[in-house]
Amino acid sequence: VNIRSVVLDVGETLIDETRLFGRWADRLGVPHLTFFGALGAMAAAGRPLIDAFRLVRPGFDLEAEIAAWREEEPGSLRENFDSEDLYPDVRPALTALREAGLQVLIAGNQPVQAGPALEAMGLPVDAIHISDVWGVAKPDPAFFARVAQEAGNAPEEILYVGDRVDNDVLPAKEAGMCAALLRRGPWGYLHSELPEAARADVIVDSLAELPGWVAARR
């Protein structure tokens, strides 16, 4: 397989979400360990992230809380991220992929404002795509069809990189793409132990492993 495009997820692939969820814990009034434990429990149980919020605050309304938070702290990062949250292997790995002649895209499940936040980082990528802008999110096959459309290459020439089996590896493979499972973040570690992780073309511990892996297959 001659890989021409590498497409990367955002949360826990490019962005370390520790600070983001720490701010949420503070907002919810619970210790960081408590909230992080709740998030991990939901990840292990295959339950949606929002269930962790509702566990520590029954009846939690995400949209209402974000709106109130924005009004109270208009100048803070709140539920968003910035360049300080970028994993240290991101820039070197993306640079190496670009220098190898590969198209590098970002496409992940994120709110609209994640687009400008990523653009502001000046990452060495060809384009940045956000689910809330597209109006379709992973694991919907339509998301991966859109990825292939934006890449302009055949699905088998695209490597999708993410930290989840359910949202990244399996739907990418169903779309005919290659898939890399990144073993970091709560989901990355948990999902690397699932039997379905074997569907990934490669499991990596760092983005730094990608340029060499792709080069060996071109």
Segments (PLM) and residue ranges:
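N-terminal helical cap/lid subdomain that shapes the substrate entry/recognition surface
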Residues: 1-102, 111-115, 124
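Asp-based, Mg2+/Mn2+-dependent phosphohydrolase catalytic module
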Residues: 1-6, 91-218
